Amino acid sequence: MQNSLQVAQVIISALPYIQKFRNKIFVVKYGGSAQIDDTLKNDFVRDIALLQLVGCKVVVVHGGGKKINSYLDRLHIKSEFVDGLRVTDKEAMEIVEMVLSGNINKEITALLNKNGARAIGVSGKDANLLKARILNNGKYGFVGEIERVNTYVLNGLLENGLIPVVAPVATDDEANSYNINADLCASKIASALKAERVIFLTDTRGILDKDGNLISKLNEAHITALKEDGTINGGMIPKVDAALECVKNGVANAHILDGRLPHSLLLELFTDDGIGTMIKG
């Protein structure tokens, strides 16, 4: 009986958040270990299905770094990271697109549909969803930055009760393909849609200070200082830059969460304290 009462209390405590977030748009960047571990995969898709069930409009943008690394290693194709971004030559770009659009995207979409959600898998190439240009004059190879997001397509899918699952591959006006950093892709989509929240699932507890303690809230000034002293570095830089860009462009809050924690998405959104780092404008 006591356990049942506790369950009821948890549900009731989430009610204000459910009411607040109904019909709001959430963009979730899905990557890291949560994409590899079968238990975490199932937790994630059920969390997304629940968000849809309680009336949230959800867009999922996925990465695929671990699986891309695996395929590149198997094919003996070298790959390196510069400034937290994967340098992508033409040969690697073919593998990146195959893994993101053909493998991971369809797996996530199928799992969501299996668990009661209504999801549709798309690439940034579909219906000119994402138009890009080459980043930094080709410093990173076939890595692009998004210039335009086709919000008509995304809003149409959301209004019809679908969850767009977006593979971060885009083209330019000459139909050249580009690898888009998934964090920056999620940021651009969230900004274009004026989303309520954007959530980045990572393999850390959030943003940590030099002593390894979680920083629960940050603003631009704090972020600048932490980047200058090296606290924020490596692969966390594009995540933080992506989060900051969102809140500058009208997204209410950005969240960086530990995707290794079961149901971290629900804990962050539907509890008073949250469990990650929230970035505010």
From Swiss-Prot:
Recorded superkingdom: Bacteria
Chain positions recorded as substrate binding sites: G64, G65, R86, N179
Pfam family, one: AA_kinase
Protein keywords: Amino-acid biosynthesis, Arginine biosynthesis, ATP-binding, Cytoplasm, Kinase, Nucleotide-binding, Transferase
This protein's GO CC annotations: cytoplasm
E.C. numbers: 2.7.2.8
Catalyzed reaction equations: N-acetyl-L-glutamate + ATP = N-acetyl-L-glutamyl 5-phosphate + ADP
Pathway connected to this protein: Amino-acid biosynthesis; L-arginine biosynthesis; N(2)-acetyl-L-ornithine from L-glutamate: step 2/4
Main location: cytoplasm
Keyword Cytoplasm: yes
GO function term, MF aspect, one: acetylglutamate kinase activity
GO biological process: arginine biosynthetic process via ornithine; L-arginine biosynthetic process
InterPro entries documented for this protein: AceGlu_kinase-like_sf, AcgluKinase_fam, ArgB, Asp/Glu/Uridylate_kinase, Glu/AcGlu_kinase, NAGK-C
Subcellular location field: Cytoplasm
Residues annotated as site: Transition state stabilizer: K29, K239
Family matches, as NCBIfam families: argB
Family (UniProt): Belongs to the acetylglutamate kinase family. ArgB subfamily.
Reported function: Catalyzes the ATP-dependent phosphorylation of N-acetyl-L-glutamate.
Full protein name: Acetylglutamate kinase
